[in-house]
C-alpha cells in the first residue's frame, strides 16, 4: 500500500514526460480526477478519461500528455507541496502566481480541487497539493 497516492500520481506524470510518453495510466480516485481536470483546464494535458478493467476493483485514469510542436515538454516541473507528514494550507491572499503566471498551484478546497487562479478569483483558501510549471 502506498502512503501518498497524490505523490505517486505526480511521479508517474513526471516520469512519463521525461521519456516522452503520449499517455500515462494512474489508479483512479476522486482527488486524482480533480487534479487531472485542473491540469486539462490549465492546458498542461490534452485530455483524460477513466477506464475500468473487469478483473480490477479500481479503475484507472489515462492522461494524454501534451507536448509542443517540436516535442518540447509542456510540463517542465511538477512537485508535491503539502505532504502527509507536513500539510500546507494557504489563504487566497497568500497564493502568489507561480513563475509570473506561467505555472499553477493546485489547491484542494471546500469547492473541490481547483487551480490557484480560481482560488484567488473565488477568494477560497485550502490545502496546496502541488505546483506545476
UniProtKB/Swiss-Prot annotation:
InterPro entries: Ribosomal_uS8 (IPR000630), Ribosomal_uS8_CS (IPR047863), Ribosomal_uS8_sf (IPR035987). Part of the 30S ribosomal subunit. Contacts proteins S5 and S12. GO terms for biological process: translation. Belongs to the universal ribosomal protein uS8 family. Keywords: Ribonucleoprotein, Ribosomal protein, RNA-binding, rRNA-binding. The keyword tRNA-binding does not apply. One of its GO terms (molecular function) is structural constituent of ribosome. The gene is rpsH. This is Small ribosomal subunit protein uS8. GO terms for cellular component: cytosolic small ribosomal subunit. One of the primary rRNA binding proteins, it binds directly to 16S rRNA central domain where it helps coordinate assembly of the platform of the 30S subunit. Pfam families: Ribosomal_S8. The keyword Ribosomal protein applies.
Amino acid at each position: 500500500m502506498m502512503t501518498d497516492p497524490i505523490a505517486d500520481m505526480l511521479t508517474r506524470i513526471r516520469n512519463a514526460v521525461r521519456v516522452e510518453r503520449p499517455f500515462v495510466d494512474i489508479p483512479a480516485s476522486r482527488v486524482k480526477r480533480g487534479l487531472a481536470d485542473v491540469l486539462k483546464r490549465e492546458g498542461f494535458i490534452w485530455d483524460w478519461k477513466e477506464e475500468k478493467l473487469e478483473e480490477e476493483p479500481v479503475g484507472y485514469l489515462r492522461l494524454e500528455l501534451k507536448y509542443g510542436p517540436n516535442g518540447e515538454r509542456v510540463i517542465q516541473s511538477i512537485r508535491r507541496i503539502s505532504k502527509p507528514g507536513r500539510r500546507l494550507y494557504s489563504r487566497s491572499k497568500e497564493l502568489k502566481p507561480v513563475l509570473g503566471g506561467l505555472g499553477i498551484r493546485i489547491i484542494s478546497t471546500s469547492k473541490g480541487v481547483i487551480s490557484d487562479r480560481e482560488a484567488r478569483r473565488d477568494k477560497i483558501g485550502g490545502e496546496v497539493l502541488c505546483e506545476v510549471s
